[in-house]
C-alpha cells in the first residue's frame, strides 16, 4: 500500500513513533518506517540496544542523529533484544535506503503480546500518515 509517496507494507504493525513491527510468534522484528526515515532525513548515526537488554513499551531503546534531528528511539513494544542490526551503526543510511529490508533495527522477544492491540494496521497507519502530512501542509 502507498500513502502519497510512502511505502506501507500490509503485513506489518505500526506505531505513532514511525516504527514498523513484523510479528512471528513471540518474536518481532522492528525498524523505522519509510515515512519515518523520510521525515528524519539522512541518518548519520544510530546507537542501538544490545542483545539481552530489556525494555518496556515507550522506553528509550536507542538513539538517532540525522541532518535534521537528534533524539531517542522509543520502544514500540515491551520485550528483550534478541539481536540488533549492528551493520546500521557502521552504515546507518541503510535505514534510508531499505527501511523494510536491510534497514531493520531489532529482533525482540515480546514480553506482553497484548500490547499489539495498541499498534496500527496498515490502513490505520496510512490514515495517520495522511493526517500528519495534512497537518504539516497547513503549518507550512
Please place each PLM-identified region on the residue numbering.
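Short, well-structured beta-strand-loop connectors
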Residues: 50-64, 80-83
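Residue-level recognition of specific faces of alpha-helices
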Residues: 45, 60-63, 72, 80, ...
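Acidic, low-complexity mobile loops and tails
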Residues: 1-57, 97-98, 102-113, 118-140
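Mid-chain, well-packed structural core segment of small domains
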Residues: 67-102
Amino acid at each position: 500500500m502507498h500513502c502519497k509517496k510512502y511505502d506501507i507494507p500490509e503485513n506489518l504493525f505500526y506505531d505513532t513513533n514511525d516504527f514498523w513491527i513484523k510479528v512471528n510468534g513471540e518474536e518481532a522484528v522492528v525498524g523505522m518506517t519509510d515515512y519515518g526515515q523520510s521525515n528524519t532525513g539522512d541518518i548519520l548515526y544510530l546507537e542501538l540496544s544490545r542483545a539481552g537488554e530489556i525494555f518496556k513499551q515507550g522506553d528509550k531503546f536507542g538513539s538517532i542523529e540525522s541532518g535534521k534531528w537528534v533524539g531517542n528511539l522509543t520502544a514500540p513494544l515491551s520485550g528483550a533484544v534478541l539481536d540488533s542490526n549492528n551493520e546500521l551503526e557502521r552504515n546507518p543510511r541503510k535505514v534510508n535506503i531499505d527501511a523494510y529490508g536491510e534497514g531493520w533495527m531489532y529482533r525482540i522477544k515480546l514480553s506482553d503480546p497484548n500490547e499489539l492491540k495498541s499498534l496500527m494496521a496498515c490502513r490505520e497507519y496510512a490514515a495517520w500518515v495522511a493526517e500528519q502530512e495534512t497537518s504539516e501542509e497547513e503549518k507550512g
